[in-house]
Every structure is written in C-alpha cells, then in structure tokens.
C-alpha cells in the first residue's frame, strides 16, 4: 500500500526538454514505464494544464476509467457477475473480457464505463488455463503417454463448441500455443495440465479430444483461467467480496483507498501495446477522430510496423486511443510530414484537453481569405484567390487530382451549362449519354462537398434531415385532408 501511495504522490509527466533525459523511468507506472527508452522525434512542446496522471484522477473519473481483475466464483454466469458489479459500483456500463462458463473460476476482466471501449480488444487476447481432466480408465503408457498426447494437441486444431455452450455449433479452427503437464495420477484417472491458447478455445472439447487420442475417453473435471490478455492471477486479483467491502468503506467511512486498490486504471490493459506519445495540443483532435500527423508526434517505440495496432498516449501517461500505425519506426525517424496513425478506437473523452487546431499561421491566413471571399466556404480556391496562395498552399486532406482540378478550374458555371446544353442538342439521346450526365452530376455533387469540415458536414446533414421531415409532415397533412374530403 505504501508503494501505491508514493506512486500517486509523485509527479509522473514527460516534460519539455532540450537534450537527452537523464531520469530513470524503470519504476514509473503503466504506459510511462521506460519512456526514456522511446525514440524522440522532438523534445519541444507546450504543456497544457489539462488531464492528469491515471493514478491521480479524482475518484469518479478513476472508477469510470477503471478495470477490475476479478476472481470469478463458481456457479454464477459471467453476465450475472458483471451485472452484480454494475450494481455494487453504481456504474452506468460494465463489460467483461470473455465469457467463462458458470462452473469455471479465475480471471475475468471487468471494464467499467469508459473502459468498456477496450472490451473488444481484450476478448480477442490470448488466454491461459489450468485444467483438471478425468480419464474414464487407466492408460497403459501412464504419464509418458499422456504427455505425448498433450504435445500432439498443440498448434491449429479443429473444434466444435460443446452442447452446453450457448453458441452456434460451427466447426472452427483454434490455436493451442503451449501446454504443460503439472500432475498425473493413473490410479485415480486424474491429470492436471496448463494450456496457453487463442481466445475462443474450448478446453472442454480439448479434454474430449485427449480422451479419444488416449483411447479411454475423458471429460473436463474442473477449470480455472489464470490469465486473460494482459492480466493474470498474480496481478491484483480481487473477489466480489473485496469490491463490496471497498464500496462499503467509501460509503460509510469515506475511505477511498480500498476502491483505488481493487480498481486499476484502464491503461493497465494497454501495457503490451507499442506506444506513440502525442503532443498536448494534438490530443483533442485525435479524440474527435483526426489522424495523428507528424507535427503532433513527440516520441515513439522502436519496432513499429505498418498496420500494427499501437496505443496513442499523452505526456501524462493517459491512453487517448488505440490506433493503426501508418508508418514504420524507420519512416517516423526520417519523415517530416504525413500520417503517423489513424484511430481505431477512441478511449479518452472529448474536450478533456482544449481545442488547438486551426491556430497555426497557415490556418489563420486561410480563415482571413475565407472571410474576405477569396476562398469558398470549404476553403477551396476560386477566381478571386491570390496566385501566391494557389502555388504555395498544399491541401493534404484533399485528393491530389481534386485539388489540382480546383486550382486550375476557371470556367464559369454558365459556360459549363451552355456547353452541356450544346452537347445534348448535338448528340442523340441514348442510355449511355444519360449515364454520362448522371456521372457528371455525381461528380459535381462530390466536388461541391469536398473539403468541408466535420461541423459543416453535420450542419448540412441536419438541415437536409429537417427539410425531409418537413416535407413528410406536409405530405401526411395533405393526405389526411384528402381522406377527410372523401369522407
């Protein structure tokens, strides 16, 4: 407990620095551990007084961004246990890392409120089990024969879910990574083994297959999950009673230390991911779904590959999102522009950090030109746009052909319409020509909405929806009046 208190009291934050850091970060918590070993793109950034270290969150935020490594008891189902947790902690949402059968015990990661966004990633993570198997008869080869059979059942295996399972009984392929025999008693027909496997593996089916291999038949007697994803039973495992007592202590004694001990920050599930540290000024843009670009990058881990899942984090060690890397470590070290990662699952709340986009010199110049009417409302060039802007400004968000077309386009709408009319008069009407006209209309429509911001798109869609609803109301009113007249 003394260690956790000390960790909460200390200030764990990446500070702006001119040279290499001399601080040892081996004992720093969660995502900041060994951050000094990360590769540095730049040490310069402006810290923003927003957000805080995961261990220093106020209790409400700590619980709503927390996970519990629960020791599931035997008999209740996983869904029942999670529902009880929701009621005990008075949370809005809870989720778990993968179903355990009612009789199975062990690690069940319960995610609370904001942390439920990580449920999908944890359900697909690897699992480890310890199983007690009961054979239906003695085997002549004894322990050696059992070991051989266990080794045979490694790698990719065909499995069909047991009858007891509440899922469709389809044949599926699951991988057994490793297995070890702990104990075997041929006289009592019992064996205990450990297995590391892919998510969705049925150990009950594995036991039946072992029995078939040994030629005597077998079934699963008992099962315990000892690891689920990033958490194992040595990593702060708590019981339902611990959670109930911790909540009672807070309600009656106002002592939150027990709740902080049973609940861990959601960042503890992401320690196995490769890290990318984001500048404070870029955090809120990523929360709104923006891709992380090179200027917003501070540090990154070695060995990142393209399309690999990474965790985007703040300088205070908070997880922002799970992203898909768009550049490898080598490219990140050498490039000065481009997309670093795109967001797969956003974790952090929006507007926890202030908005900082649109405040650069180019963005401010663009705003001035838009307000002066020298750019259209979507920021695209028109006939009044200065030649210097057309040549120097590069729009990275727009497709190259579209921006080139927009820059070179000087024909008035009337001329285009006149040209189209002339072509229609000259050419005989055919299905092909109609299709061409339709394509032209679609292209025009697409270009008209190109380059608009998320807020402008949302506003346009809202107006369109209101117009549609108004039209439907008018239509239904007209139909009602017509029916009244006919009566």
Swiss-Prot record:
Q: Where is there biased composition of kind Basic residues?
A: 460-477
What does this protein's UniProt record list under function? Catalytic subunit of H/ACA small nucleolar ribonucleoprotein (H/ACA snoRNP) complex, which catalyzes pseudouridylation of rRNA. This involves the isomerization of uridine such that the ribose is subsequently attached to C5, instead of the normal N1. Pseudouridine ('psi') residues may serve to stabilize the conformation of rRNAs and play a central role in ribosomal RNA processing. The H/ACA snoRNP complex also mediates pseudouridylation of other types of RNAs. Catalyzes pseudouridylation at position 93 in U2 snRNA.
Q: Name one GO molecular function term.
A: snRNA pseudouridine synthase activity
**PUA domain segment(s):** 273-348
Ordered alphabetically, the record's keywords are: DNA-binding, Isomerase, Microtubule, Nucleus, Repeat, Ribonucleoprotein, Ribosome biogenesis, RNA-binding, rRNA processing
EC code: 5.4.99.-
Task: Tell me the compartments it is located in.
Answer: Nucleus, Nucleolus
Please give the name of this protein: H/ACA ribonucleoprotein complex subunit cbf5
Family label: Belongs to the pseudouridine synthase TruB family.
Query: Which positions are catalytic residues?
Result: 101 (nucleophile)
What SUPFAM superfamilies does the entry give? Answer: Pseudouridine synthase, PUA domain-like
Could you tell me where the Basic and acidic residues compositional bias lies? 435-459
Could you provide one GO biological process annotation from this protein's UniProt record? Answer: rRNA pseudouridine synthesis
Identify the main location.
Answer: nucleus
Q: Does the keyword Isomerase apply?
A: yes
Q: Which superkingdom heads the taxonomic lineage of this protein's source?
A: Eukaryota
Q: Which species is this record about? A: Aspergillus fumigatus (strain ATCC MYA-4609 / CBS 101355 / FGSC A1100 / Af293)
Q: Which gene encodes it?
A: cbf5
What is the enzyme's main class?
isomerase
Task: Name the SMART domains on file.
Answer: DKCLD, PUA
Q: Does the keyword Nucleus apply?
A: yes
Q: Which Gene3D superfamilies match?
A: Pseudouridine synthase (3.30.2350.10), PUA domain (2.30.130.10)
Query: Oligomeric state and partners?
Result: Component of the small nucleolar ribonucleoprotein particles containing H/ACA-type snoRNAs (H/ACA snoRNPs).
A Pfam family per the record: TruB_C_2
Q: One GO CC term of this entry?
A: microtubule
Signal peptide residues are none
Biased composition, Low complexity: where in the chain? 400-410
Q: Where is this region: Disordered?
A: 400-487
């Amino acid at each position: 407990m003394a260690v956790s208190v000390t960790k909460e009291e200390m200030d764990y934050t990446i500070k702006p620095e001119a040279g290499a850091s001399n601080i040892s970060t081996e004992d720093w918590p969660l995502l900041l551990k060994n951050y000094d070993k990360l590769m540095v793109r730049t040490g310069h950034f402006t810290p923003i007084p927003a957000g805080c270290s995961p261990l220093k969150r106020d209790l409400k935020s700590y619980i709503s961004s927390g996970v519990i490594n629960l020791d599931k008891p035997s008999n209740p189902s996983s869904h029942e246990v999670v529902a009880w947790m929701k009621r005990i902690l008075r949370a809005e949402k809870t989720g778990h890392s993968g179903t355990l059968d009612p009789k199975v015990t062990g690690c069940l990661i319960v995610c609370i409120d904001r942390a439920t966004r990580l449920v999908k990633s944890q359900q697909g993570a690897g699992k480890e089990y310890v199983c007690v198997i009961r054979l239906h008869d003695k085997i002549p080869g004894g322990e050696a024969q059992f070991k051989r059979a266990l080794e045979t059942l490694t790698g990719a295996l065909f499995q069909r879910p047991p009858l007891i399972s509440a899922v469709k009984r389809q044949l599926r392929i699951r991988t057994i990574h490793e297995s070890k025999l702990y104990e075997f008693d041929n006289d009592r027909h019992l064996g205990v083994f450990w297995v590391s496997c892919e998510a969705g593996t049925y150990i009950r089916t594995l036991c039946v297959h072992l029995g078939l291999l040994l030629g005597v038949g077998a079934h699963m007697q008992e099962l315990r999950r000892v690891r689920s994803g990033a958490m194992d039973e040595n990593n702060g495992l708590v019981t339902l009673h611990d959670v109930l007592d911790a909540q009672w202590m807070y309600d009656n004694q106002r002592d939150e230390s027990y709740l902080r001990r049973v609940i861990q920050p959601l960042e503890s599930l992401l320690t196995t991911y490769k890290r990318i540290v984001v500048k404070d000024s870029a955090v809120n843009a990523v929360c709104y779904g923006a891709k992380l670009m090179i200027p917003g990058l501070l540090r990154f881990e070695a060995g990142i590959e393209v399309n690999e899942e990474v965790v985007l984090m703040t300088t205070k060690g908070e997880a922002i999102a799970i992203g898909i890397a768009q550049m490898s470590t080598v490219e990140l070290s050498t490039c000065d522009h481009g997309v670093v990662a795109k967001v797969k699952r956003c974790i952090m709340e929006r507007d926890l950090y202030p908005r900082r986009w649109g405040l650069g010199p180019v963005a401010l110049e663009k705003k001035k030109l838009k307000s002066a009417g020298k750019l259209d409302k979507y920021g695209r060039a028109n006939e009044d746009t200065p030649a210097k802007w057309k040549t120097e400004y590069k729009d990275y968000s727009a497709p190259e052909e579209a921006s080139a077309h927009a820059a070179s386009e000087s024909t008035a709408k009337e001329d285009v319409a006149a040209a189209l009319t002339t072509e229609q008069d000259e050419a005989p009407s055919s299905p092909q020509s109609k299709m061409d006209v339709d394509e032209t209309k679609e292209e025009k429509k697409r270009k008209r909405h190109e380059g608009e911001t998320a807020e402008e798109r949302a506003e346009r869609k809202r107006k369109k929806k209101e117009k549609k609803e108004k039209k439907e109301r008018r239509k239904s009113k007209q139909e009602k009046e017509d029916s009244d007249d006919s009566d």
